[in-house]
Swiss-Prot record:
Alphabetic keyword roster: Cytoplasm, Methyltransferase, S-adenosyl-L-methionine, Transferase
Entry EC number(s): 2.1.1.-
Record-listed S-adenosyl-L-methionine binding positions: 177, 198, 220, 264
A single GO molecular function term of this UniProt record: protein-lysine N-methyltransferase activity
Origin: domain of life: Bacteria
Swiss-Prot/TrEMBL GO biological process terms: methylation
Protein's UniProt name: Ribosomal protein L11 methyltransferase
InterPro entries (UniProt xref): Ribosomal_L11_MeTrfase_PrmA (IPR050078), Ribosomal_PrmA_MeTrfase (IPR004498), SAM-dependent_MTases_sf (IPR029063)
Cell location: Cytoplasm
Family: Belongs to the methyltransferase superfamily. PrmA family.
Broadest EC class assigned to this enzyme: transferase
Length: 329
């Protein structure tokens, strides 16, 4: 009797990883796992370490089409994205990723590339294996954990955030989310009104509510993100009050002014939303999801309307805490 099989895909995206992760999510509706050699070593997964370290990776580059389908080693084999499927997606997903690369090149006027590996394995409880790989993480004052890990008794309820990272929406493990939470943790938000732009999993909105904001608005252009935010509100026993709103759409649907705005989104969207943030922000604006290579272009746009109070960086990811200049209405 043949054993049931499943397929495991490994991806390395040298540029705009979050854009590629969102594409994978929208295309496959499957869980993604951000992993690294360090995490595989922690779980003593010698088989997978050997596979990704010794295999020749497939490579695709929009700026060097002659290299298409050549096999080579990624220059930085450290962090990667894992996708698991009960179906072989090589003939559908990989061509779709290549087409996505080409569309990014056309829209952003820059070259894009990615590395990938795949293998098929005898079926096992890989969902359970995935769960075991997702560990709690401490982000400043917040202890972030999935529902299958219990909160330690010494951690206060207001400092605990429960997120099941089944979708690529933000679980506290990504650098851009963690440094954004660090900047939020230092603020006195009691009786303030707040806006979370690109709410994703709702992790930043939950942090805002736990820090005492009196009114919260959150928005995302992805309907799945809105559903995920509402689900995680319920998971964390966050009650939406009459003045709280979770909206499917962008900032154009938001009215009023906010004491604090947070946006953990890609740099190109941050740049396009400058005038909207000027319209909506009364005081503090926290921006994250900015790759170091895009930082100067973001600062050039925001210089006229905002003062940089603090800048934090982890690996290639940067977050900014900005103060709106009083001369700007």
């Amino acid at each position: 009797m043949l054993k049931p099989m499943y397929y495991e895909f490994f991806f390395i995206f040298p540029k705009e990883q979050e854009l590629f992760e969102s594409f994978l999510l929208d295309t496959t509706h499957l869980a993604l796992e951000e992993s690294s050699l360090e995490s595989l070593k922690a779980f003593d997964d010698k088989e997978t370490i050997e596979f990704i370290s010794q295999s020749s990776w497939h490579y695709f580059a929009t700026h060097d089409p002659l290299k298409e389908n050549l096999k080579e080693k990624p220059p930085h084999l450290k962090n990667f994205v894992i996708l698991r499927s009960q179906k072989d997606l090589n003939d559908s997903l990989i061509p779709a990723l290549k087409a996505f690369c080409l569309s990014l090149q056309q829209n952003l006027q820059s070259g894009f590339d990615f590395f990938y590996l795949s293998r098929n394995l005898a079926s096992k409880d890989w969902l359970e294996a995935y769960k075991q790989a997702i560990l709690p993480v401490q982000c400043a004052k917040f202890y972030i954990h999935p529902s299958w890990h219990q909160k330690p008794s010494h951690v206060a309820t207001d400092d605990s955030i429960m997120i099941d990272p089944a979708l690529a929406f933000g679980s506290g493990h990504h650098e851009s989310t963690s440094i954004c939470l660090e900047l939020l943790s230092n603020l006195d938000l009691k009786r303030k009104n707040a806006l979370d732009v690109g709410c994703g999993s709702g992790i930043l909105s939950i942090a805002l509510k736990k820090q005492g904001v009196s009114a919260l608005s959150a928005c995302d252009t992805d309907s799945l993100a809105v559903e995920e935010t509402l689900k995680n509100f319920s998971l964390n026993q966050i009650t939406l009050l009459a003045q709280d709103k979770v909206i499917h759409g962008s900032t154009q649907k938001i009215e009023g002014r906010f004491d604090i705005i947070v946006a953990n989104i890609v740099a190109d969207v941050i740049k396009s939303l400058y005038s909207e943030f000027v319209r909506l922000c009364n005081h503090t604006l926290i921006l994250s999801g900015i790759l170091e290579t895009h930082l100067n272009s973001v600062l050039q746009i925001y210089y006229n309307g905002f003062e940089v109070l603090e800048q934090r960086q982890r690996n290639e990811w940067v977050a900014l805490k900005l103060l709106k200049k009083q001369s700007i209405n």
